[in-house]
Amino acid sequence: MLQNTINEFFETLSELLLSIEVTDRNGAALSLDAGAEQTVQMMLETKDASQKVLLAGNGGSSAIVSHVQNDLCKATGVRAMVFTEQPLLTALANDEGYGSVFEWPINMWAEANDLFITVSSSGQSENIVRGLKAAREKGCRVITLSGFNPDNLSRRLGDLNFYVPSNVYAYVETAHTALAHFMTTKAAG
């Protein structure tokens, strides 16, 4: 539940930021610092290998991944792309169904060892999950940011998985944004 005052909101947000859970592909827990460091390392390895960072999210999460793309390209020099260009997104949604809007471009553009990052408050969106499965099949490395339910599907599909223990969009999306800012700023040096 959203708090009544801004101070209460910030106190709850601060507690949540420090409670973010990180797991690896096998579900083993990592510290938040270790997860963030591994993410930054993966971003820099992607740059050094001339690979791509591919990003996907819906709604507010789409805005977050667009911002991450901007920061990776401009500040870090990483080749990064999002799959939210309206003509392609609406064509795929209309012709193939909304569940395909991330899977289809992953199948077209992703290559082995690219890095696929998803941001999803629920971690359950069909199009995100299908994109994650396609990325795994292509041999991509995968990072997920999710919230709401600790057993969400996205969290089972990443090499690194960041989970915000809240079911309030405002907290989950703000935490995802903070994670993204830290990681892209650190990667930029």
Segments the model singles out, each with a brief description of its role:
Residues M1-G189:
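Conserved N-terminal alpha-helical segment that immediately precedes and caps sugar-phosphate-binding
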